[in-house]
Amino acid sequence: MKNKIMAVVEINNVYKTYNDTEVEVKAINGVTLSFEKGDFAVIVGPSGSGKTTLLNLIGGLDKPTDGEILIAGHRLSELKPSELIDFRMDHVGFVFQSYNLIPVLTAAENVGFIMNLQKWPKEKRKARTDELLSSVGLSDRHKSRPSQLSGGQQQRVAVARALATRPEFILADEPTANLDSKSAESLLDIMEKLNHEEKMTFIFSTHDVRVMKRAHRVITLEDGIVVSDEKMIN
């Protein structure tokens, strides 16, 4: 009998409701999903369907109104706010549409930022930073600040930063939205390589057909409801 693979992420009957001027809006409406190690999954749907809300819930940036989310077997609802911050830094990597790099820090300092917060020894931090910048093709841009980098290069720094603490998975919210075609394909090549070689789990939200074409799994949301969940043959 095969051992059951523990899900990296489990979402159990989750709801997220907002009250806007006395009108109740169900942004997420009874979603149940799970993601396993090595998934390269894409969440799609029209604007307002709940894609970003769902990613924020998975990453512990927002709390569900009802239901339960487990990361590597840990219930997010049982963590105190301070514990949740530490848990996110250890287990979840984030890549945002607008890069979210710190303007006054160099590429290397941005990548090492969370490691610095976690008080990694200097030599260990430097070695990990060097390894990551090399893995995203930026070994020659350690000292460059975000303003000295193209959009594609900034997003590659963001991916390196997200990988710094060897998280369970990466959440990527519209990561190619601000990139030209060449930069987007280059970024996706890097993410796909990390997925293939290191079994890094990626969960995207996107409107980008280029991302969808590479996905192993496409989940479609409409009005906060999962209307389809398809395995893709690449």
Residues of each region from the PLM?
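ABC-family P-loop ATPase nucleotide-binding domain
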Residues: 1-17, 228-234
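ABC family nucleotide-binding domain
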Residues: 7-221
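Residue-level detector of flexible, active-site-proximal loop/helix-junction positions
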Residues: 83, 225, 233
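H-loop (His-switch) and adjacent beta-strand-loop-beta switch element
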Residues: 218-230
